[in-house]
């Protein structure tokens, strides 16, 4: 587990919000290149390794995570040197105030900033504390005025990411970090590429990571258009509801995600997932999603693409501190390897036998 923790720490501490995924793209290029036949990018910056098949009728299979994490973007530098921001991806305003962040300038400098909050002293006589709107939360780097902030290279459009380090829980079973959504998926495809290195598959495999998922599943549109897969496997992290009495319990294995508002699991795909999990002894749990994944975009492309999401759940996602189980990652990785190895022409035709 020590090695796995080190890998997770490395990938989760990369800073890359939607549209600014270069650090993760560089990471994946390095990890994928030794294990695939070629590495390509799409027009928005998604990156994918290709493993060619010797089978004449090999189906095209796309396995894609997403590189981006949630964060913010500077919308205005105020005269007093503080910043207004717009959110990149979904945030609960309750977790934004009084946190440390990194502001990334155009020339690559990291500027420490914090998100402001109103102390209780200043709310007395005004009806007490209220829920802030993110547009009203001030981000503060300690600058005297706008000119000083600009002298450090800060401009509107610069990105802001949580400043948070990965740590182990006391029982050494779980990890607390930022960005498990979706550096989970990034590490999954990296580990998959290494596991399949040198192996011959019954499919033409495209494996890598999309961009801009957190702002509308945008990268999934470009990659599925580019590669025209017959099957699409998203690899993504979902919110755990276990401490609130809901679905998704950390430590209970990978997810069979049968529903979310943007995607329904087709019967043929569901049978394939369950049969494979049971044959391989994979620990899994059923999951009804309330958000979406890249499968929601991919399955509607190119006349329709049978899709699913190979996922795990984590507590408190889209915040500085997400908590998740390493065993769930291992279960999901074993599941993904088993699925990819079985996706030959006959299996894909069976999934699509309407």
Where are these regions (language model features)?
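N-terminal hydrophobic/helix-forming segments and targeting peptides
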Residues: 1-354
């Amino acid at each position: 587990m020590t090695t796995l923790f080190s890998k997770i720490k490395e990938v989760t501490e990369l800073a890359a919000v939607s549209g600014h995924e270069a650090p993760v793209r560089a990471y994946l290029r390095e990890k994928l290149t030794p294990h695939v036949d070629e590495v390509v990018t799409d027009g928005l910056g998604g990156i994918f390794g290709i493993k060619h098949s010797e089978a004449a009728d090999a189906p095209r299979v796309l396995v894609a995570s997403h590189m981006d994490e949630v964060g913010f973007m500077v919308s205005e530098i105020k005269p007093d040197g503080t910043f207004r921001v717009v959110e990149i991806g979904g945030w609960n305003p309750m977790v934004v105030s009084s946190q440390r962040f990194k502001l990334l300038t155009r020339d690559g400098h990291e500027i420490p900033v914090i998100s402001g909050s109103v102390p209780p002293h200043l709310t007395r006589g005004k009806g007490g504390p209220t829920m802030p709107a993110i547009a009203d939360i001030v981000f503060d780097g300690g600058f005297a005025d706008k000119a000083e902030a600009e002298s450090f290279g800060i401009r509107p459009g610069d990105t802001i990411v949580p400043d948070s380090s990965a740590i182990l829980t006391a029982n050494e079973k779980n990890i607390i970090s930022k960005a498990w959504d979706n550096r989970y998926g990034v590490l999954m495809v990296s580990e998959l590429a290494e596991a399949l290195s040198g192996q011959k598959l019954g499919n033409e495999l495209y494996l890598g990571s999309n961009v801009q998922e957190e702002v509308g599943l945008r990268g999934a549109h470009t990659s599925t258009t580019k590669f025209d897969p017959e099957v699409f496997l998203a690899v993504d992290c979902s919110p755990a509801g276990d401490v609130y009495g809901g679905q998704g319990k950390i430590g209970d294995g990978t997810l069979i995600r049968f529903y979310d508002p943007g995607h329904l699991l087709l019967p043929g795909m569901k049978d394939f997932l369950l049969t494979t999990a049971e044959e391989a002894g994979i620990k899994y749990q059923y999951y009804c999603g309330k958000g979406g994944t890249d499968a929601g975009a991919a399955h509607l492309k190119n006349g329709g693409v049978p899709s699913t999401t190979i996922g795990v759940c984590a507590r408190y996602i889209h915040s500085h501190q997400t908590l998740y189980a390493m065993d769930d990652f291992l279960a999901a990785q074993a599941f993904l390897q088993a699925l990819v190895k079985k996706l030959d022409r006959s299996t894909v035709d069976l999934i699509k036998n309407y």
